[in-house]
A protein has these predicted regions:
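A short, flexible loop at the N-terminus of ABC-type nucleotide-binding domains that lies
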Residues: 1-20
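Conserved ABC ATPase "signature" region
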Residues: 86, 90, 98-115
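The feature captures the beta-strand-to-loop junction immediately N-terminal to the Walker
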Residues: 34-36
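Helix-to-loop junction immediately C-terminal to a conserved catalytic motif
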Residues: 49
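Q-loop/switch helix immediately C-terminal to the Walker
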Residues: 72, 79-92
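Catalytic Walker B motif of ABC-type/P-loop ATPase nucleotide-binding domains
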Residues: 144-148
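Hydrophobic anchor residue at the start of the ABC signature
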Residues: 133
Length: 270
């Protein structure tokens, strides 16, 4: 999939929200979209997902199946959660037993099966969000676009969504996401798209900086020792940054490599 000189504005006399966006969206890639509030991230995601058309430029090669989770799910639809998902399954060509398996499977994985008989209008924000996520994942999409999809979810559902993202990427799907938490899927993104205030988008390779919250035990009046373990696409770079930090001494370090990540780095520092 590719964006060529893509721009979007809402009216010919309105300012450009995003403009001049040229980027590839390769299969099997995880892309984090970053930017300040109001910078145009949601608009860009809608264009990528095909929810709204670009005002200029071209989007080519979009996968036939695309899943999209909006920042705000329209919970007032006249369906129960299960009715809505069965309807969306039919829209995606999943009928009969195939549709039933997908609907019930995602309801179970997201912890929503016991509430799916409720009307969407009576559901909590978190439960509506689970319905939005389930509908996006029903067709096993080749393109998955997530706009603050983790907001309002309980811990188990957040973990289920993390797993679903990893599965889509492993199966060759492309995933783009926005999330206010800088630690969301930390170290896993293949690229970052930074949306500037002028509507321009800068494409950066790599996962970017990783923030790891830790509890540090104090073992002396001036010295603190802590063991940090994390998964990252570039474990060597993380260790180099630790060694370069003022006031930090790396006592020991090890790197384990796996097929799913660039490395698992463990370090004891003081």
């Amino acid at each position: 999939m590719r964006l060529d000189s893509v721009g979007k504005r809402y009216g010919v006399r309105q300012p450009w929200v995003v403009r001049g966006v040229s980027a590839d969206v390769p299969a099997g890639r995880l892309i984090r979209v970053e930017g300040r509030n109001g910078s145009g991230k949601s608009t860009l995601l809608r264009v990528v997902a095909g929810i709204t058309a670009a005002s200029e430029g071209r989007v080519t090669g979009r996968p036939a199946s695309a899943g999209y989770v909006p920042e705000r799910f329209p919970g007032g639809l006249p369906f129960s959660g299960r009715e809505y998902l069965r309807h969306m399954a039919r829209v995606h060509g999943l009928r009969g037993a195939a549709g039933y398996r997908q609907v019930e499977g995602w309801l179970e994985r997201l912890g929503a099966a016991g509430y799916a008989g409720q009307s969407l209008g009576s559901m909590s924000k978190g439960m509506c969000q689970k319905m939005a996520i389930a509908q996006a994942l029903l067709p096993s999409p080749g393109l998955l676009v997530l706009d603050e999809a983790w907001t309002g979810l309980d811990t188990a559902a957040r973990e289920a969504l993390d797993e679903a993202v990893a599965e889509r990427v492993a199966d060759g799907g492309a995933v783009l996401f926005v999330d206010h938490d800088p630690a969301r899927l930390a170290g896993r993104a293949d690229e970052r798209w930074q949306v500037g205030g002028d509507g321009a988008v800068t494409v950066l390779a790599g996962p970017g900086p990783v923030t790891v919250p830790v509890t540090v035990p104090r073992i002396g009046p001036r010295v603190q020792r802590v063991t940090v373990r994390l998964e990252t696409l570039d474990a060597g770079a993380v260790l180099s940054r630790l060694r370069a930090m003022d006031g930090v001494r790396v006592l020991s370090a090890d790197v384990e490599h796996s097929d799913s990540a660039g490395g698992s780095a463990g370090a004891e520092v003081s």
